[in-house]
């Protein structure tokens, strides 16, 4: 906490910190990065489905009252934000903040539409949504006007980053050492991909699913294959809730030309992504099989998940590959190496942005 108050200061530097209407559940037990207290998490309410397996449903009167009370905090919060941010000169954070509040406007518009359709008599909730939307739109406009005036760096610098690693995250590395490790991982993944391509040179390339039906069938079969392999190899205990936790994160079909980096691989073999989604098993375990001790029942107060969750999910991609998950589909190993190359490159982009070597737009070009 002391480091956040003294150095990071999201409440004084980062406009996006005040975007308090959250639309998507975090894939870690505790949200990554600073999250403002009192955030309104829409997926806690049936009007906003938490997963692709859930459907929109009407709010009870108690739920509507609770949601309205949460949304009524938005306008005073954003009014206070203007004063709190007055001394911030972090240009990239201001530019990024504009989009954060544009997205909050879009979310509140969608929420208003759903409430009109399913809770038309909840006038107080509708009024609270309108008030929050107006305040959000006004702050977005103010940020657009102010952003060009903010010209300072947004990264905290290498010295502060190293201190954060060592004394807050308890990772015994410096910024420079993380750069060295990440560059080495990028080179290792790149070389491994070339070896894999040479090994598979006589094999046909993986074909991408060309229709929604084919993509759904591909995802269904890959989940079944993954869970069956875990049982057969005794890698871990397969719990009854694990299949649903994966199915909750199934993606819609994307036609060729609209597939992002991850969809390019996922439309050929979704298994590498399912191995990465270890994240959601962490979440489901905490939610569905709570620890008997109240101290260990929820996310730890020390947010170890900021490093553990993504690191663990990424390493699972390679662990499962080396244990034989793709023995029947050698070309899928190429997807794993490509994904690992991407994650290493993204890591370098993040490190260089914190060091103010790259701005956020340049780092974003790497981030995918």
Predicted regions and their residues:
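N-terminal maturation segment of proteins
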Residues: 1-368
């Amino acid at each position: 906490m002391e480091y956040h108050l003294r150095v990071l200061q999201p409440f004084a530097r980062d406009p996006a910190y005040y975007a308090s209407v959250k639309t998507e559940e975090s894939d870690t037990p505790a949200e990554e990065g600073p999250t403002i207290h009192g955030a309104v998490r829409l997926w806690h309410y049936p009007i906003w489905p938490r997963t692709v397996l859930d459907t929109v449903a009407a709010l009870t009167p108690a739920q509507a009252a609770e949601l309205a009370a949460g949304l009524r905090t938005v306008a005073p919060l954003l009014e206070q934000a203007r004063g709190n941010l007055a001394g911030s000169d972090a240009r990239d954070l201001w530019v990024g903040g504009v989009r954060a509040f544009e997205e909050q406007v879009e979310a509140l518009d969608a929420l208003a539409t759903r409430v009109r359709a399913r809770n038309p008599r909840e006038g107080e909730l509708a009024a609270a949504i309108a008030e929050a939307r107006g305040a959000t739109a006004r702050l977005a406009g103010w940020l657009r006007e102010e952003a060009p005036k903010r010209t300072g760096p947004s990264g905290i610098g290498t010295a502060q980053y190293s201190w954060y690693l060592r004394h807050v995250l308890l990772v015994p590395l410096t910024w420079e050492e993380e750069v060295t490790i990440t560059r080495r991982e990028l080179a290792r993944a790149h070389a491994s991909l070339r070896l894999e391509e040479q090994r598979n040179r006589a094999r046909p390339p993986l074909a991408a699913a060309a229709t929604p039906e084919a993509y759904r069938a591909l995802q269904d079969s890959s989940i079944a294959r993954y869970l069956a392999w875990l049982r057969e190899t005794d890698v871990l205990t397969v719990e009854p809730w694990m299949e649903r936790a994966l199915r909750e994160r199934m993606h819609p079909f994307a036609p060729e030309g609209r597939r992002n980096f991850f969809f390019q691989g996922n439309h050929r073999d979704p298994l590498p992504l399912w191995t990465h989604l270890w994240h959601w098993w962490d979440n489901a375990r905490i939610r569905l099989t709570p620890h008997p001790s109240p101290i260990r029942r929820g996310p730890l107060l020390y947010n170890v998940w900021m490093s553990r969750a993504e690191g663990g999910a990424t390493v699972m991609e390679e662990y499962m590959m080396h244990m034989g998950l793709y023995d029947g589909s050698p070309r899928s190993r190429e997807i794993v190496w490509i994904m690992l190359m991407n994650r290493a490159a993204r890591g370098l982009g993040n490190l260089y942005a914190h060091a103010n070597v790259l701005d956020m737009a340049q780092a974003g070009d790497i981030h995918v």
